[in-house]
């Protein structure tokens, strides 16, 4: 993965990207939503859906974006997110980024 600058997108642009079936557009929408979308629950739910995507780059973006939500918004539904991330941690294609995301959550949201 190489760094890509994250740009704000409107909700309509996010929905268009997420429903595009284009892994690059989906990734871009997930990153933008996790950084800039004010409705963190909406973004969280989309990330949880895309954790199961067939493209490993999309799964990577979904996992990392959950950490970004914790970092930028200081909120997540931990009862939904933590079990999903722990399950995703078994995926060798994204296990390292799942670990990074779990670290971001632990640093930014009180988990106990």
Where are these regions (language model features)?
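A structural signal for the main folded, soluble domain(s) of proteins
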Residues: 51-55, 66-67, 77, 102
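Structural detector for internal amphipathic alpha-helices that build alpha-solenoid repeat scaffolds
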Residues: 1-5, 27-38, 60-73, 96-108
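Amphipathic alpha-helical scaffolding segments comprising HEAT/armadillo-like alpha-solenoid repeats
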Residues: 5-17, 38-50, 74-89, 111-112
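Leucine-rich repeat
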Residues: 41-57, 61, 69-70
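Short, amphipathic alpha-helical segments
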Residues: 79, 92-99
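Short inter-helical turns and helix N-cap capping residues of alpha-solenoid HEAT/ARM repeat scaffolds
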Residues: 21-22, 54-55, 90-95
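Membrane-interacting alpha-helical segments
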Residues: 14-27, 57, 61
């Amino acid at each position: 993965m190489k760094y890509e600058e994250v740009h704000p997108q409107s909700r309509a642009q996010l929905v268009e990207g997420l429903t595009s079936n284009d892994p690059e557009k989906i990734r871009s929408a997930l990153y933008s939503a996790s950084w800039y979308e004010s409705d963190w629950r909406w973004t969280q739910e989309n990330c949880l859906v895309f954790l199961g995507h067939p493209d490993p780059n999309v799964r990577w973006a979904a996992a990392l974006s959950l950490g970004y939500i914790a970092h930028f918004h200081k909120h997540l539904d931990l009862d939904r997110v933590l079990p999903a991330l722990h399950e995703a941690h078994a995926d060798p294609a994204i296990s390292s980024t799942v670990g990074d995301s779990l670290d971001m959550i632990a640093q930014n949201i009180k988990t106990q």
